[in-house]
Amino acid sequence: MIAITLPDGSRREFPGPVTVAEVAQSIGAGLAKAALAGRVDGQMVDTSYTIDHDAKLAIITDKDADGVDVIRHSTAHLLAYAVKELYPDAQVTIGPVIENGFYYDFAYKRPFTPDDLVAIEKKMGELAKKDEKVTREVLSRDDAVKLFQGMGEKYKAEIIASIPEDQEIGLYREGNFVDLCRGPHVPSTGKLKVFKLMKVAGAYWRGDHNNEMLQRIYGTAWAKREDQDAYLHMLEEAEKRDHRKLGRELDLFHIDEYSPGTVFWHPKGWTLWQEIEQYMRRVYRENGYQEVKGPQILDKTLWEKTGHWDKYRENMFITESEKREYALKPMNCPGHILIYKQGIKSYRDLPLRFGEFGACHRNEPSGGLHGIMRVRGFTQDDGHIFCTEDMIQAEVTAFTTLLQKVYKDFGFTEILYKLSTRPDKRIGTEESWDRAEAALAEGLRASGCEFEYLPGEGAFYGPKIEYVLKDALGRQWQCGTIQVDPNLPERLDAEFVGEDGARHRPIMLHRAIVGSLERFIGILIEQYAGALPTWLSPVQVVVLSITDSHAEYAQSVAQSLQKQGFRAVVDLRNEKIGYKIREHSVQKVPYQVVVGDKERDENQVAVRARGNVDLGSMPLSAFVERLKNDLANKS
């Protein structure tokens, strides 16, 4: 007998080996029809998979996140099937699932056009309606290489040839199309009903710029039409909020071909940057951090000691001087340990919290650069806490509480907490991992946080927490982190004198709240669609004169606001007031103050808030109180 345990704890027994589909059928016809795949003892499998032992089984449908991934993976194969039907000379390469969709890379003699995408999507629909069965086959590596070589698919043959000789190769067949894949896939193409091709882009074979350029077709696929419609609407809204577009329109920054992946901040953008930096600097001061500053360039021998020279060198910018090799720092942590090591540290000095607005450089591939979100030169609100093992929990609690306040001040109230635990390849004892993971978990609980475990996702030297914020469009951004690290202090010989008089290694907690300031500013721009809260706006008030006769009063109003610390400018141009109001509205200035005869004569100001809200006339002192309230409330 084969005993199958279902997620609700119930058991079903079968006289012999049984497929996932048969188990689903035994539960009910509705579930059998909805089944897309199964999870047997934690492993994702096809519905045709035969279970020949007592096992735990979950039937996967389109209501499960894994089910949607199966739909997307299968739709990527459907895309390749359609391309081969329409363009037999095209060669297929790889087609993975990505966030909200999938892509597939093709080699073809000419670029695919928008009209081609329309034709391919139409063919995909036709193939899906045929409801062809999707079947799995297993071949030896050499037989699989011969199969794809015989089909003229040199890229697939190359991939398979790189797989160990003794490893079996899984293939999936639907109609006339066969592809290499681990699976699982939907049982038939008729399960694929909601999809759309999005765009074509270039991609190097195997991600190496020395290889030939392929064509990458991106698509999206969903369980329900309304889910796809909501996603497409979100994309439309995201396009309107694109920080690259708004950065140009609002004159905040630009990226120049003379320095790819680094940011040229314009006066308005740099004002925004400084406001965030000064805010975070106050956060440092008020929470026991000492601000430090390390050099940009460090000798390669330091990076050899940390292990980065061997594992990360290709992502570092290297330079040479007087026969010594140096690297622009890609992270700040080694420098903070060198500062820590200056002078003997006692257990009484711990926890010791360093913070730095550290400029880092990483040699990211040019194809991965994206506005100010993904750059080569960036600055982090980088902090490191040197402490003992029994201090970790309290530090995590304090840091998490602080992070929540900071995110709230910036307008982010929905935060996801993810605790990454020990990977298979790791250093340290099981007991030390137990203690570190427990300290992180208890630190989160003490902060009132519900969190998700990410098994095996920790670094080789210690567990970490990722703090993921959700923006106005529901997108997730991982900005904050706290990481337990006993390894780097060991490598760089950091010590403190314990209560027992002996020397001990400190634990190092790597932590960041906003992470890269460049990326965080990009997130803020998109969160607010450029209409930043008053406290962050580069220009908080613009004073507009109606005619030249009001210029002197307008200037006096602007100067009064400036002296009180507000970012105010004055527009004295001889233009129609409606034109000036529209122009500054496009620039998303929080407040426009209009002054004419009435305002000048009565010593008042006519105030318009962003969004064309007329607040009427008021004394300047009343408007100042409104501004102060905005700044105090971070609005």
From Swiss-Prot:
It comes from Ralstonia pickettii (strain 12J). GO terms for molecular function: ATP binding; metal ion binding; threonine-tRNA ligase activity; tRNA binding. PROSITE patterns: AA_TRNA_LIGASE_II, TGS. It is found in: Cytoplasm. Residues 242-533 are annotated as: Catalytic. InterPro entries: aa-tRNA-synt_IIb, aa-tRNA-synth_II, aa-tRNA-synth_II/BPL/LPL, Anticodon-bd, Anticodon-bd_dom_sf, Beta-grasp_dom_sf, TGS, TGS-like. It catalyses: tRNA(Thr) + L-threonine + ATP = L-threonyl-tRNA(Thr) + AMP + diphosphate + H(+). Catalyzes the attachment of threonine to tRNA(Thr) in a two-step reaction: L-threonine is first activated by ATP to form Thr-AMP and then transferred to the acceptor end of tRNA(Thr). Also edits incorrectly charged L-seryl-tRNA(Thr). GO terms for biological process: threonyl-tRNA aminoacylation. Keywords: Aminoacyl-tRNA synthetase, ATP-binding, Cytoplasm, Ligase, Metal-binding, Nucleotide-binding, Protein biosynthesis, RNA-binding, tRNA-binding, Zinc. Belongs to the class-II aminoacyl-tRNA synthetase family. SUPFAM superfamilies: Class II aaRS ABD-related (SSF52954), Class II aaRS and biotin synthetases (SSF55681), TGS-like (SSF81271), ThrRS/AlaRS common domain (SSF55186). Zn(2+) binds at residues 333, 384, 510. The keyword Aminoacyl-tRNA synthetase applies. Signal peptide: none annotated. Its main location: cytoplasm. Pfam families: HGTP_anticodon (PF03129), TGS (PF02824), tRNA-synt_2b (PF00587), tRNA_SAD (PF07973). This is Threonine--tRNA ligase. Homodimer. GO terms for cellular component: cytosol. The keyword Cytoplasm applies. CDD domains: TGS_ThrRS (cd01667), ThrRS_anticodon (cd00860), ThrRS_core (cd00771).
